[in-house]
């Protein structure tokens, strides 16, 4: 087996990735597969931090358009990410992987409050640390949270798991001739207006020199291939 090229990663999972073909909620089989793929990385001595979105359970921006206060909607979205985090922690524990769930705000009795030094300590002990509740502030996406936590824990890369094989020049679902990029610079992504993540998250990563790798988590074994340096997905640096 190839050696990992990253020592510490921040894995960003979208909430939608957890729902599978269900269209809503959490597909237990997908959750269990992801837990086993993360377990593989731990066995390779890779330190893993995880940020999960909440779009499979709740979308604050949609309700904001319907008249709900955006702050309230975003708070509800943050709680959805905590629910996903609880599910992921449970799946990891069932796979015999030590995992810790941290929330950006206090939720006594449910999970720990985010603490930077504690997170670093646990990562060094090869425990998976799941960061939930986004950044803890409204108006910021979970992509922003992933880049922020990645920078804070000094990860080597932010791995953005999606439903497509990487970054394309146009939507591959609408255009079968869409071209997949293997490598891009931050400037190219902005110039070509490619949809990698929202601009606030992307510029945060760019300003701190945090590489982003976009890949398809739907492909079994793709996470391991990304971490061992196979030409999987798109790298942005």
Swiss-Prot record:
Signal peptide location: none
Record's keyword terms, sorted: Allosteric enzyme, ATP-binding, Cytoplasm, Kinase, Nucleotide-binding, Pyrimidine biosynthesis, Transferase
Pfam families (UniProt xref): AA_kinase
Entry-linked InterPro entries: AceGlu_kinase-like_sf, Asp/Glu/Uridylate_kinase, Uridylate_kinase, Uridylate_kinase_bac
Family: Belongs to the UMP kinase family.
Upper taxonomic lineage: Bacteria, Pseudomonadati, Pseudomonadota, Gammaproteobacteria, Pasteurellales
Binding positions for ATP per the UniProt entry: 12-15, 55, 59, 162, 168, 171
Record PANTHER family: URIDYLATE KINASE, URIDYLATE KINASE PUMPKIN, CHLOROPLASTIC
Cell location: Cytoplasm
Protein name stated in the entry: Uridylate kinase
GO biological process: 'de novo' CTP biosynthetic process; UDP biosynthetic process
Involved in allosteric activation by GTP: annotated span: 20-25
Record's GO cellular component terms: cytosol
Biological pathway: Pyrimidine metabolism; CTP biosynthesis via de novo pathway; UDP from UMP (UMPK route): step 1/1
Catalytic activity: UMP + ATP = UDP + ADP
Function: Catalyzes the reversible phosphorylation of UMP to UDP.
Entry binding sites for UMP: 54, 74, 135-142
Enzyme superclass (EC): transferase
Molecular functions per Gene Ontology: ATP binding; UMP kinase activity
UniProt EC number: 2.7.4.22
Regulation: Allosterically activated by GTP. Inhibited by UTP.
Subunit structure: Homohexamer.
Gene: pyrH
Organism of this sequence: Mannheimia succiniciproducens (strain KCTC 0769BP / MBEL55E)
């Amino acid at each position: 087996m190839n050696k990992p090229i990253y020592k510490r990663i921040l894995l960003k999972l979208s909430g939608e990735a957890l729902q599978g073909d269900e269209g809503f909620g959490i597909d237990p089989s997908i959750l269990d597969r992801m837990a086993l793929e993360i377990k593989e990385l731990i066995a390779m001595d890779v330190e893993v931090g995880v940020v999960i979105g909440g779009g499979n359970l709740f979308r604050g921006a949609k309700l904001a358009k319907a008249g709900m206060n955006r702050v309230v909607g975003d708070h509800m979205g943050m709680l959805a990410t905590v629910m996903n985090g609880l599910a992921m922690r449970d799946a990891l524990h069932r796979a015999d992987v030590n995992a810790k769930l941290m929330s950006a705000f206090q939720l006594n009795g449910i999970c720990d409050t985010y603490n930077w030094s504690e997170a670093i300590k646990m990562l060094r002990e090869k425990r998976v640390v799941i960061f939930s509740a986004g950044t803890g502030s409204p108006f910021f996406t979970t992509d922003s949270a992933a880049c922020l936590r990645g920078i804070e824990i000094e990860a080597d890369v932010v791995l953005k798991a999606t439903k497509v094989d990487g970054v394309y020049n146009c939507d591959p679902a609408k255009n079968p001739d869409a071209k997949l990029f293997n490598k891009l610079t931050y400037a190219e992504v902005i110039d070509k207006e490619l949809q990698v993540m929202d601009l606030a998250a992307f510029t945060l990563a760019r300003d701190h020199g945090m590489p982003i790798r976009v890949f398809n988590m739907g492909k079994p074994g793709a996470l391991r291939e990304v971490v061992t340096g196979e030409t999987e997905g798109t790298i942005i640096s």
